[in-house]
Amino acid sequence: MMRRNSGTRPFGARVAWRTVMAAVVAMMAVMTLVVGQGLAGAEPAPAPAPASPAAPAPASPAPASPAAPPSSAAPAAAPAPVPPGKVTNTYWYTDRRVALWVYSPSMNTNIQVQILLARDWHAKPKEKFPQLTMLDGLRAQDDQSGWVLNTKIVDFYKDKNVNVILPIGGESSFYTDWKEPDRGKNYKWETFLMRELPPILENDWRSTDVRGIEGLSMGGSAAMMLAARNPGFYKFAASFSGILQFSSFGMPQAIQFAVRDGGGYDSMKMFGPPSDPAWKEHDPYVLADKLQGTSLYISSGNGMVGAHDKPSDIPLLATNYSGVGLEMLSRVTSQQFAVQLNRKGIPGQAVYRPSGTHTWPYWEFEMMQAWPQAAAALGLSRDAVACRVDGAFRKLWDANKGDLGGCLTPSYGVPGGKAQDFANGRIFTGPKGPKIVTGAIGGAYVAAGGPGGRLGKPLSNEEPTRDGKGRVNYFEHGRITWTAKDGTKVLK
């Protein structure tokens, strides 16, 4: 059965707020009615006017209080053969973060996918690792993951033995296959994530078929939807502030408003008119029975002012007005979804926070809170860092430990010597003793083949360039420079 946070109380509209917040009060009143009377199936209520979130928080749809839709939907059609994706470009941000540009035949465009590599990626080059996909919100950018821009995801996963997969882009897409192109984009995200990308991750980037998926807001909705539409594909699925009902009363109209506000898209081109069966065929609530056997984590705040919100002059209300309404909507649909899982005897973890709006600090917290459950589902519950600084590297590490951080791996063999990985870089043996390679230069060194590549072993630590405008590492057969203007360059 679902496990719940026992310290949470239902939210309501009992505070007499000001006239300017009448819409929010009405929304809360409707939701209180749903929570009090309708967790097993609420009567439909008219949809209040949704609000859009302030940047940079990604927005979720702002639905009306949902009524319980039918408990089943037609299964997804058997997939037709799909040509595999193809990597057209690769860029190493660091020695542990790499960006791939993958040509998607179904979308006829390149999709950027970043990977945060597993802790032992370099130390154990013959091993494969589980994978965890992290989906973005409604306002997903085309150049960078919101997780990277707004959270400490890169640091959090450094010591974990999982390949973290970050698809870039997909604004307002719900990571699904749209019926028609819109705004110059032919969204086929489900095809990409389920069929075009996996062979690349598993054949070329040492990922196993043990997979998890998490998302915030729109990405949380998509995580549950994709897991339900593809039973068994994911071992773990998590929704942080997701909207987990698509086809209930008023929901298609609310989603239409959200995707228009989130980028000028038309949800009719996604699933068709509200009467189209596609709405139910993608509804996590309707598809809940398909999640049997998947480890589930569902969380939301309640829209009340929390630790990461700025209080307004209205009691209990944050200044992030749109984030208030969106999080309340997430709360209600998440509770309805949890009740549906209970009805079907599907276990999971439902966490209802006593405060918090629809914004990034809360999603970063949930990412960290969900990890133990994700680790267990991915077979990593007993995984932990087990290393000491190698004696040959101790003196250099002692002098630089503030920058390098703690060790992640024991030392291991590389062509012509050995290396050891730390939180913020690596130490290699070399002709002039152990040397540090880190940051963007460390990424370029991996791209150049590392100690066994064309540059050979390092001859220096990273140091200022002669003109003082950048940084440089010297190697046996060349050097790598970095400047803020030009990035990294490999030179002879």
Labelled PLM ranges:
Residues 11-17:
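Short, low-complexity patches enriched in S/T/P/G
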Residues 92, 382-492:
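Extended, compositionally biased repeat/scaffold regions that form elongated interaction surfaces
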Residues 12, 116, 173, 184, ...:
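Alpha-helical structural elements
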Residues 2-5, 17-384:
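Non-catalytic cap/lid and distal C-terminal segments of serine-dependent acyl enzymes
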Residues 7-9:
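Juxtamembrane low-complexity tails/linkers enriched in Ser/Thr-Pro and polybasic
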